Every structure is written in C-alpha cells, then in structure tokens.
C-alpha cells in the first residue's frame, strides 16, 4: 500500500474519462483543477465527471480547486508574442491597456509603478526573461532587457523583494471560491498566501457560502509567505511548497532549504504538506524522468511530505499516464526505505501538553508499531480527527480510517498513510473492534493471526476525543 498521497493536475492531456479513470486506478488521491485557466462551465463538467468516476471506482478521490490569487500577468501582444534582445529598452505600462510589441506591454497590476524602484528586477515567465528597472516615468516602468527571449500573452510577472499591495483574494478568486462551495469541492489551494490574514479571508468566504467543510491549502510562493510560515500554519489546514514562483521570487539556492523547513514545521504541527512543481518536469516531453527528478520525489518523501503533485506533467504533457505511474513507483520505493523512527523522533515534544490525550495515544501507537509486529492501525472516526493525529506521527504500518461519512473520507485524502472506508455508525467498543478486524482483512493488509491496533474515542457521541488504543489479534 502506498502511503504518500498523489495529486494530479487535470488539463487537456487528462480530462477525458479514460485518462481520469486510469488516474484513479493508479492511485490519484486528489484531482487538482487550476482556475487560472478555463471557465466555470468547463470546470463543472470536469468536477461532475470526477465525481461520477470516483463513485464507480469506489474511491475517495478528493477535488482540489486551485484559485489564481494575486498573480501579476502581462496583457496581450500583437500576434500573441514579441522577441526581446539583451540590452533592449522595454517598458511595462501600468496605465491604460495597450497592445504589446517588442518595446512595451501592459501588466495587470496597475500600482506596480508606485512600489518598484530603479535598480529593481522584473522577471517574466517563471524567470525566463529578466529586466532591470532604469527609471519610473509616470505610470511607465522603463527597463533594460537583461535576459531576452520570447515574451507572450498572459505570462506571470514577478518582482522579487518588492512587497505588493494586491489583495489576497481578487474578485475572480471570490467568484471561484463561491463556485467551489456550490460544487462541494473538498480542498481549496489559495495562491500567494503572504500572511495569516490571507488564509482567514479565504476561510470567511468559504464559511459564508456553505463551505465550512472545505479544507484550505496555503501555497507559499514568496519571501513574505516564508517569513510568516509559523503563523500561517496555525490557521491553515495544509501548506503547499509551490516551488515555481518561489524559485523566481527567492534565490534558487534557498528553495531546497525552505522546502525542508516548511515540511518539518508542518509535520510538527500535524498539518498537511504538499511538495509541488517540476517534480517530473521532463516527462512533459519524455516518457522517462531524469535521475535528478527521481531523487527529488524520493527526497521529498524522506523529508516527511504528505503528498506530491504533478502539474504540467499530467495536465498538458505528452505522457500523463507514464508520469503518474512513475511517481507512484518512486514513492513506493522511497517508503520501503523510509526511516520512520527518525521522522517520529523529530516530532517528540519535550514539553507535551498534559491535556493532549489524542497526541499521546497517537505517538504511543506509532512507537509501538515500530517495535511490535503490527499490520495496521484502525481508527474509528466521525470527524477525521483521530486518523489525522495518527498520520502526524507517521507510523510504519498503514492507518485505516473507518467513518460513517464519505465527506470525512475525502477530507483525509491528503494525509500520509491513511486509507479509508465508509461504515455504519458505532455504538460500542465491541462494534468498532469487530469492524476493525473485518476491514484489515478486506484491504488484504492483515490475515488471521496478525496483530492490529484500534484507536477510537469514547463515548462515541463526542467528536475529537481520541482516548483509547487497543492491540487486537485477528
């Protein structure tokens, strides 16, 4: 059983019924829909198709809606693009929209001229093009082309080390979030989160439109977000290490260190952490990854990531199925060599909260699983809380969450090591233990004579009160 969760971005290469069904069978735990592209009508079709397929495949595949966020972009060019040479003068216009050419273009952030200073850098298209600001003339930013190339319509614009005043949630984002509530998606990925207040703004919109159960994944893509990561983790459900824009906004040599630090902080807080962007990037064009990409996926798992994500590889690449299968194979091999004791040791709190019974029980369960032959930990849960806390401590054996609610199953889709099954509501300890034995055999994780652990909270009518751990022989 694979423990590391996989998120596949759905796009032109993968939005057919055939590919989506194969993704689910390979082990797609969440389907990511990028709302920087497409309209509500096209996304509705995809969501309805995914919902139908996951029902047919009896899968708990979650749907993750990724909002565009306060991204600065270029506007249109004549013929869709223009060629720029090193040393050319080029103007970014913050005034009225103009049609771009090889001397100028408009950008979506109309106040950038107020924020940027001569000597500053502007990067376009994930840093492929670089400009140095010479002067600011009214609403025009006059630059020298440092690294030329082809500049195109609607490409991302980054301004490293310049705090921007764009709102955390744009009007388009608000509309997309409300649409997500209407479509009952499971997760929202909020782009360019810079401070905890940004997360709370997204939360307020979701809560006020029937989306209280939707979990928020905060995408960290700037130095400001990195600087505020501790406070962001406190208010978010999970974090995505979004290395694309991060690697443009922040010196590239810092990105691996930041990735490791964010993963560790999320692990310690028991929050979901996703490693994303360019994990198998060469598989957009080739049927096999580079050795460095295979190492990247493996090392993210060794660091403690809960989930790994494909972007262009699955959305627009030539080999979406091969990329998905390759990612799964690398994950399984990494897990077979994972040092679970190391991950557990670095989570131990030297000053534990004496009231944190659930944490104490979950830590003990993971510790016991590493020393005592245990095939699975079965967690009976109404809210997902018991299973999530067990996942925090990354036991060496699988966690089987049994719950009466499909929505809870999907809320656990991105937590490391959890598989889930819907079952009837439990009224007693005996019922839970009997069901635990049954599902462990059903998933072919345990056989007669094997040991499992059962974790639950009593009385069962109270949610979030994990207070029991029992070893049972099947």
Swiss-Prot record:
Substrate binds at residues 32, 244-245, 277. Pathway: Carbohydrate degradation; glycolysis; pyruvate from D-glyceraldehyde 3-phosphate: step 5/5. Its EC number is 2.7.1.40. PROSITE patterns: PYRUVATE_KINASE. K(+) binds at residues 34, 36, 66. Its cofactor is Mg(2+); K(+). InterPro entries: Pyr_Knase, Pyrv/PenolPyrv_kinase-like_dom, Pyrv_kinase-like_dom_sf, Pyrv_Knase-like_insert_dom_sf, Pyrv_Knase_AS, Pyrv_Knase_brl, Pyrv_Knase_C, Pyrv_Knase_C_sf. One of its GO terms (molecular function) is magnesium ion binding. It catalyses: pyruvate + ATP = phosphoenolpyruvate + ADP + H(+). Gene3D superfamilies: Phosphoenolpyruvate-binding domains (3.20.20.60), PK beta-barrel domain-like (2.40.33.10), Pyruvate kinase, C-terminal domain (3.40.1380.20). Pfam families: PK, PK_C. The record marks 219 as: Transition state stabilizer. Keywords: ATP-binding, Glycolysis, Kinase, Magnesium, Metal-binding, Nucleotide-binding, Potassium, Pyruvate, Transferase. ATP binds at residues 34-37, 73, 155. It comes from the Bacteria. Mg(2+) binds at residues 221, 245. Belongs to the pyruvate kinase family. Homotetramer. This is Pyruvate kinase. It comes from Clostridium perfringens (strain 13 / Type A). The gene is pykF.
